[in-house]
From Swiss-Prot:
PANTHER family, sorted: THIOPURINE S-METHYLTRANSFERASE
Known EC number: 2.1.1.67
This protein's GO CC annotations: cytoplasm
Protein name stated in the entry: Thiopurine S-methyltransferase
UniProt keywords, alphabetically: Cytoplasm, Methyltransferase, S-adenosyl-L-methionine, Transferase
Species: Shewanella amazonensis (strain ATCC BAA-1098 / SB2B)
Gene coding for it: tpm
Amino acid sequence: MEPGFWHDKWQSQQIGFHQSDINPFLVKHWESLKLEGKGKVFVPLCGKSLDMEFLAAQGHEVIGSELSALAVSQFFEAAGAKPQSRTQGEHVHHSAQGVTLIEGDFFTLDEELVAGCSGFYDRAALIAWPAEMRIDYVRKLAALIPAGTPGLLITLDYPQEALIGPPFAVSPNWVEEFVGEYFEVVVLESQDVLADNPRFVKKAVPWLNEAAYLLVRK
């Protein structure tokens, strides 16, 4: 899955992975991280997610990583903000209203960019990757996140053969085995969300579970 795949998705606005509302699990479980103060929060593969506005409204400085320049511009446009932009290495930093979106390749991010973050949030990053690439993402995330840092992970799970991702199915067992190699994993909640996802209903996917996990970097 090359960068061009995601650029094409944004250019054609085939962004079914984008949610038009703040994720309910984020609202319900963010406090589970028990963050002290209102520190920085890292959001990998953030797109133009409204979840970042929620995090900023909690007083956090949000640091998002996003490949698509179009996604970045659409986020700030929707927020009615005109970001200040600067180039740092091969990435471009866009900042406004407590949110900084780092435009460029997630896999080439420097650890220093997220070293000061007190928490992280992954709603659409892990599930964006097919199984053969997902482990590389987890390893990079683990390399960026300092030991002891908590995060909220939200996944989807369904019979993968029933639908061509993204989003891809990520089972609880996969999270325990591969994410658990680098993070302490606590299941916060899992529920059937098939009725709320017309694309999956239309494709006759028999079931769809959304799960929230509390992660802590080992």
